[in-house]
């Protein structure tokens, strides 16, 4: 946050004037008005003045990218001078210059005026965020495109070409589709390659300087759904169609990602709904989501910005958490395959991300996101022909419950599964609500347990975090009574517990597994 609020206010007013000038420039080009060169010079002078003031503020608040965005806008204006084709000029002003100026305004407003003050940030989230990034509009009840394919170039030009080749093969024929190609400062070769691709349904944003901020993409998409990917990824031929089928299979699904494999396993897989796995968190290097809902703009950083580095692995964690807490289901389509270039993890980014995420979202995103293989190895998932009911007790994000559900669906070809949740930890209550058919928060097991799902019987009961009350003999006996014939109860504890002589019973790692 910058200290000189008056300076910030004046700069915002200057950028607002610049934004109006950009729209006027578009009108002048459209109508073949005279005085275009002088008008552009005036805009350049205004940008240079803004840049001089903003550069000093970046020293004060390093999270700002406004100086880079202003420099990108200057580069765009210079580029216009060398273009004679009217249609191309209009495209650059509309798809590059105006969005760059809009991004500069929001950047200074939020990172200069709100971050890192939580109260100011939440004020922005609640009252301004959606105003600056409105969802695409319909025309006569219909979106302009069925699908917006948004590609963020963050690799060399050869990998960019490879990514787009696989992508073009994967986009289903017959879709009303647009492409939004975002070159985030990765060089002139990529910029030229993108410029050569400009067409009626291809929008290009060429940044001179890297910002690592794909929020600009959300200013341009006009499709019903948005497929986002970075050029580090390549897709199988059936990936997009299978992801789209998964997304539209249930109105509650908010986002879908592919399954990531090695390139030599990038097969064209037929549609297979048994491979659609509900997740607590998605990998958003490739992700498909409706354009008018909260998940895609959150992942892009247009909604709920919280971390100075912008697009990182925490973008997917933020999108997933916001999605869960808005009642949206997250799916990995196992019949949609993708391959990504290996990336080294930046420990500094991880540490900053954990700190900022926990401060704003109220939860550590790195905790308990791995499936417990010891647990799964002690359970049987075959021949489950009837409806399968799973009860989780203190299941955090529900990772293991979803893994059990996935294995039942795959191995028994059975989609009739229900997850129930009993939970003592308030921090996870809203996350569990998103995955459970029924869930209850419990503060007193003696008083409340008998009232919880009294008629339900379970194939699996999984107690992930224990305490003295949960390991009480009477409660354990009541839980065993809630198992169906052939059911199993898994308790995560290395301590001595009642029923130690119960048979049949198996101990795997820290899990004690009781079979009925």
Model-assigned labels for residue ranges:
Residues 215-225:
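Active-site nucleotide-sugar/metal-binding loop of Leloir-type enzymes
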Residues 234, 238-270:
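Conserved donor NDP-sugar-binding/catalytic core segment of glycosyltransferases
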Residues 116-166:
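N-proximal low-complexity "stem/linker" segments adjacent to membrane-targeting elements
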Residues 291-336:
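A short, conserved alpha-helix in the catalytic core of glycosyltransferases
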Residues 167-207, 436:
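Acidic donor-binding segment of Leloir-type glycosyltransferases
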Residues 147-159, 163, 170, 182, ...:
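A conserved hydrophobic helix/loop-capping motif in glycosyltransferases and polysaccharide synthases
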Residues 223-234:
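Short beta-strand-to-loop acidic/aromatic patch adjacent to the donor-nucleotide binding site
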Residues 125-146, 254, 268-295, 300, ...:
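C-terminal, non-catalytic tails of nucleotide-sugar-dependent glycosyltransferases
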């Amino acid at each position: 946050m910058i200290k000189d609020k008056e300076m910030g206010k004046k700069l915002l007013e200057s950028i607002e004037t610049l934004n109006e000038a950009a729209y006027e420039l578009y009108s002048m080009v459209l109508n073949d008005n005279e005085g275009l060169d002088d008008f552009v010079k005036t805009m350049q002078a205004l940008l240079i003045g803004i840049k001089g003031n903003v550069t000093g503020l970046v020293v004060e608040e390093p999270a700002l990218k406004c100086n880079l965005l202003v420099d990108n806008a200057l580069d765009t204006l210079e580029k216009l001078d060398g273009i004679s084709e009217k249609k191309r000029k209009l495209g650059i002003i509309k798809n590059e210059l105006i969005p760059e100026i809009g991004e500069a305004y929001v950047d200074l407003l939020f990172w200069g005026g709100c971050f890192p003050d939580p109260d100011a940030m939440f004020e922005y989230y609640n009252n301004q965020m959606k105003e600056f990034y409105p969802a695409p509009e319909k025309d006569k009840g219909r979106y302009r495109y069925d699908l917006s394919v948004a590609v963020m170039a963050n690799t060399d030009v050869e990998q960019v070409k490879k990514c787009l080749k696989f992508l073009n093969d994967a986009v289903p024929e017959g879709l009303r589709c647009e492409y939004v190609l975002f070159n985030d400062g990765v060089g002139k070769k990529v910029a030229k390659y993108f410029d050569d691709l400009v067409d009626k349904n291809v929008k290009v944003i060429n940044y001179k300087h890297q910002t690592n901020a794909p929020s600009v993409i959300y200013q341009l998409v006009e499709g019903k759904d948005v497929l986002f990917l970075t050029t580090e990824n390549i897709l199988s031929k059936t990936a997009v169609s299978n992801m789209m089928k998964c997304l539209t299979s249930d109105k509650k699904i908010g986002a879908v990602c592919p399954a990531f494999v090695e390139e030599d396993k990038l097969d064209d897989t037929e549609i297979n709904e048994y491979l659609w796995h509900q997740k607590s968190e998605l990998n958003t290097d490739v992700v498909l989501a409706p354009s008018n809902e909260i998940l895609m703009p959150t992942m892009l950083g247009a909604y709920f910005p919280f971390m100075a580095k912008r697009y990182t692995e925490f973008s997917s964690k933020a999108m997933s958490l916001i999605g869960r807490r808005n009642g949206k289901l997250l799916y990995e389509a196992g019949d949609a395959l993708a391959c990504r270039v290996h990336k080294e993890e930046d420990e500094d980014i991880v540490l900053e991300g954990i700190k900022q995420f926990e401060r704003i979202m109220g939860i550590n995103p790195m905790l308990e996101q791995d499936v417990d293989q010891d647990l799964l190895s002690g359970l049987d998932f075959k021949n489950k022909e009837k409806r399968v009911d799973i009860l989780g007790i203190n299941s955090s994000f529900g990772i293991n419950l979803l893994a059990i559900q996935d294995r039942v669906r795959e191995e028994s070809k059975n989609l009739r599964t229900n997850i129930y949740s009993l939970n003592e930890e308030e921090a996870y209550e809203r996350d569990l609500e998103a995955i459970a058919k029924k869930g209850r928060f419990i503060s007193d097991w003696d008083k409340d347990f008998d009232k919880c799902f009294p008629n339900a019987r379970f194939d699996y009961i999984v107690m992930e975090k224990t305490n003295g009350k949960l390991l009480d003999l009477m409660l354990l006996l009541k839980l065993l009574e809630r198992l169906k014939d052939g059911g199993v109860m898994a308790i995560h504890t290395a301590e001595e517990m009642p029923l130690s002589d119960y048979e049949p019973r198996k101990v795997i790692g820290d899990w004690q597994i009781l079979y009925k």
